[in-house]
């Protein structure tokens, strides 16, 4: 049985309030933690951009997609893979099917499992740019600095 994702949110607003589902107001940072039983995903929305960190197990992928849609996501500027284990990457194939993804940030940890190889094929088929995360790397996510 799939559980609908529960969500806790941290929002830093420059004015106004979120007022429920949909994209965050202009000029705000929204960080949503997507809890789907084992593992978490994190959605970061800022400056009109959306980034997803981890997408949990394969069977939870549809719940992640539903959650992203409920937050007004129609494309992802980037996804981040914190490690290549199935409980961090399994749901990304559903995400690739549902949304265009511009950049995929991978940890660079070696892995040759079927799940990881399937994920890499999905990245290739998506046509996304791939970047390997490294210590001290700085990224601009919609005007918000993300660093490793």
Residue ranges of predicted features:
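Non-globular, low-confidence helical/coil segments that flank catalytic cores
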Residues: 4-148
């Amino acid at each position: 049985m799939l559980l609908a994702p529960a969500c806790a949110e941290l929002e830093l607003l420059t004015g106004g309030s979120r007022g429920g589902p949909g994209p965050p107001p202009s000029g705000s940072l929204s960080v949503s933690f997507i809890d789907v039983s084992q593992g978490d995903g994190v959605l970061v929305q800022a400056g009109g951009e959306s980034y997803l960190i981890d997408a949990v197990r394969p069977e939870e992928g549809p719940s992640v997609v539903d959650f992203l849609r409920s937050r007004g996501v129609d494309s992802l500027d980037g996804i981040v893979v914190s490690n290549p284990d199935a409980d961090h990457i399994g749901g990304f194939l559903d995400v690739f099917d549902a949304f265009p993804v511009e950049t995929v940030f991978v940890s660079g940890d070696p892995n040759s499992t079927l799940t990881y190889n399937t994920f890499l094929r999905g990245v290739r088929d998506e046509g996304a740019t791939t970047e390997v995360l490294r210590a001290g790397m700085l990224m601009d996510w919609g005007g918000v600095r993300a660093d490793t």
